[in-house]
Every structure is written in C-alpha cells, then in structure tokens.
Amino acid sequence: PSFSMYGEYATLSDSVAAPYPLTEEGYVDPEVVIEFCERERPALLIVCNPNNPTGNYNPLSAMEKIVANVECPVIMDEAYMEFADGKEVPPTDMRPLNKLWLVAGSTLSLVGKYSNLMVFRTFSKAYGLAGLRCGYAVGAAGVMRLLGKALLPYHVNAYTLMVAKTLYENKDLYKEQIKLVRSERDKMAAYLAKLGFKVWPTATNFVTFCAQDELTKSLALAYERKYRDCSLTPQVASGKMMFKYLMENSILVRDYSGHAKLTGCLRVTIGTPEENLTILQKL
C-alpha cells in the first residue's frame, strides 16, 4: 500500500495506475520494482519514501539501485523525510547537493547523478503548512523542463511563497519540534508493541498498528457483542472495534481495517505528549 492519491491523479490525467508490491514488512524491494518496470514499461515510476501509510524508510542504496536500473522518469516522494533520523542541512549551505550529507540519506544527493530522477518535498508535514499547499520538486534540468510543461501557470500564489520562504529561512526553529515528534513516535511504537500490537516500522510522524493473536480474538468478540455484527473477519472487526471506541472518546485516527494489505490496521498521528498519553491510556 502507498499514498492513495497517486491513483486519483493518474485517473485525472487519463492514465492507469499500476501498483507494484512491497515486502510483507512494507519495504520496497529494488529487484521487484526493477523487474516490474521491465515487464510493465511504465511511463513514470513513483516511490514514496518514507512510505505512507506504513511509515517505512528505505535506505538510499536501495533507492539508487532503482533509479539507476529503470528507463522511465522516477519520482521520489519524500513528504515525510524530515521525520527520518539523520543530519540536517543548514539553509545557508549552498554547496552542490551531492556534496551535502542530507537528512537520512535523501535522494536529493543523487539529483546531479541521474537525469531521470525527480525528488518531491513538501511544507505540509514537518512544517505544518498543509492548508497552504506548498511543495517543490528538485531534479535534472531536462526532466524538470518536462514537468514544467505539465504545470498550470500561477500554480502557487504569492502569499504561500512568502510564508514558505520565511519558514525555510527560519527552519532551525523546527528542529526541536521534529526531534520531539521522533521521540514521541518511538515511545508510542514501543508501548503499542508492549501491549501486544503488531507495529509497522516507521520513520514518519505517525504509527500504523493492528491487533494480533489473542488480542485480535478478544477485540473481535467485543465488536460482535457490542454492535451485533458477525459479518466481518476477526482481523477487520478488531480494527473496527478500536476505531469506534477511540471515536467515542473523541480521538480520530485513520481507519485502514478494511484495507486488503493493512487488514485491521489503524494509523495514529503523533500529537503532543499529553495527547499521545491519552491515546495509549484508552488503548
């Protein structure tokens, strides 16, 4: 599974989205993706890293292997990359990208090496500007010219650009906040695992998890008794039970319990330490 809007955007552009499989743990297997591209001959390949909704981070070496061995343009969607553990790059550092140590092995360091690579980043996640809809792409001149032909004129308004510029110039102010999110994320993942949940490896600002074994059975039974619904599988019912219970307690999480590849899963976004504690107490 990956970001659901890829398919929507493909449909809007009269294209067909062809998904490639991830590993059972949610990682990208370079060999599988390369073989997929050789077989399907896609016009464009998209890799979400870290992946949404599982949270997995794939190492730079794996991403480079894909870019180097496929013929089509590649979009590396790094919307959540700031949450991956790694060193930051000062905004005043103007050295070439391939000379920088970028956060958690971002593929930005490969832009000068591969002409088919585009790296997409956003201000929506780590910097909280989702409502302003400001993202950016970095790539070789040739592939960026192709992207430019598809963009509408005036696609980013002046106010959004002004806010994004100011934020980027002061992004050091966000470092402690991002560190806190990472710390709270790791605490939540560890505690959920201690409670008996299966937790997906995550390098984002969210944690995806589901019940397993006896916990699945007990939650499914509770769902059937409370809602008098025996139509769901135990795994789906366990996820629905948790989702409904949290909703009743004014806690909104993302419900993936009916998803074919994330059966029974919920995704919770990291909040303040107090909010995170409340969620864990309810669970």
Residue ranges, per PLM feature:
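Conserved PLP-binding catalytic core of the aspartate aminotransferase-like
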Residues: 181-182, 186, 192-249, 266, ...
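PLP-dependent aminotransferase-like
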Residues: 1-47
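Short acidic/glycine-enriched loop/turn segments that link adjacent beta-strands
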Residues: 131, 203-204, 260-264
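Active-site pre-lysine segment of PLP-dependent enzymes
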Residues: 27-40, 53-74, 78-124, 142
